[in-house]
Swiss-Prot record:
Protein name: EH domain-containing protein 1
Organism: Mus musculus (Mouse)
A Pfam family per the record: Dynamin_N
Family, per entry: Belongs to the TRAFAC class dynamin-like GTPase superfamily. Dynamin/Fzo/YdjA family. EHD subfamily.
Mutagenesis / variant outcome for changing residue 65 to R: Abolishes interaction with PACSIN2
Taxonomic classification: Eukaryota, Metazoa, Chordata, Craniata, Vertebrata
Amino acid sequence: MFSWVSKDARRKKEPELFQTVAEGLRQLYAQKLLPLEEHYRFHEFHSPALEDADFDNKPMVLLVGQYSTGKTTFIRHLIEQDFPGMRIGPEPTTDSFIAVMHGPTEGVVPGNALVVDPRRPFRKLNAFGNAFLNRFMCAQLPNPVLDSISIIDTPGILSGEKQRISRGYDFAAVLEWFAERVDRIILLFDAHKLDISDEFSEVIKALKNHEDKIRVVLNKADQIETQQLMRVYGALMWSLGKIINTPEVVRVYIGSFWSHPLLIPDNRKLFEAEEQDLFKDIQSLPRNAALRKLNDLIKRARLAKVHAYIISSLKKEMPNVFGKESKKKELVNNLGEIYQKIEREHQISSGDFPSLRKMQELLQTQDFSKFQALKPKLLDTVDDMLANDIARLMVMVRQEESLMPSQAVKGGAFDGTMNGPFGHGYGEGAGEGIDDVEWVVGKDKPTYDEIFYTLSPVNGKITGANAKKEMVKSKLPNTVLGKIWKLADVDKDGLLDDEEFALANHLIKVKLEGHELPADLPPHLIPPSKRRHE
């Protein structure tokens, strides 16, 4: 008796088990979030329904910038290979959206064929029509970098109303569609001719819900001198501050991202360090992909909940028979008050609400009589998903991350800076003398010996107290000096001989020059007398 009650209760008690995070997200979306979206026509207002490919696709990087800022050259620099459909020049060359992806052979897949392929995450782009699809293609080629990530090249953004209208499709809406699904958005600026056009400002504003994905690259920085570069950097930060309304400062990478010689090499070290940081950021994307998809699903669920409250509130206010049109106009005009009412009644943050102006525009064309009343069961299901299922998936995300290397992207420009003499920081700081036959500390040892013999050595060694008197003269914090002591006391006897003292002074010099100390003493820094005993 009442077997259906016990069955339902059992289903609630027993959490669903998933093999992977992607599978879990796919099932949760289809079973718990999609019914809410469909019931309140979410897809007509915000974003098309997600498909299997959206949960399984590789991390994607979206490049956005004005024409001739080096977007296509940047991709060429990363993968170290020309790709089909690539055009580079000072004039606006890239006139299409090009998805650069891995494939067994080189070739181009046109947009109309791409949007019918269920294995690709682009099927919902058919909503933008032929004008867009004729300007969309996939360049596929066998390349080790593309094994781990895909890159989206975009048309250069131009200034002027004529350019915006002549595209034939809503450029900002297409970018917003991609922004929802990519893992990283890179905005490129040309340091030599810094300018943010009106259309570029609109595009950046369209990406405002995805600030966590945005990184900025100030490209072609080798074309200007240090003093000018400082001014350009300041001007860029000031301009971005007016467009991106967040209290946090967006991360800006400065460099020259191509394989040609630097025109003005003054800032070579800065460019190398910045390039290394950007590469590390891109290399972390495969490891963080599952977390990004989880985060995006949570954002989508919160928006879907708010949307359900908005639509059901409008339905509740509509008359049954007369005066529907006049009431509709009144409700659209007073949508801000409805937002405030929902915010108060359901304790929802104002940041979860969609853009008021955009929502008002979309509601003008809708038939309010087809809207649905509030259905608490659908909302309860989504709340349960956010409270319980997502927490379980979070544990799986951490497990999957721990099994992946921190730098998963290999090949192309990423291999050039990994190891060897041209790796970042090779032969500098604690790495100085790594390839020398002689002990690198030896050249300064006579100077250090003079100090050593003034510190009252006993049996050729000085105590920690005597060493401390000399080491604190460097004015380095005790935490740093403590680490240097541990590294220099190679035989761990609590005393320093002349070689160990010289090593301690060498490490102090390394730190004072602005380099980091190694976690363990590199083999080339071990004093010669200690090597024989190993």
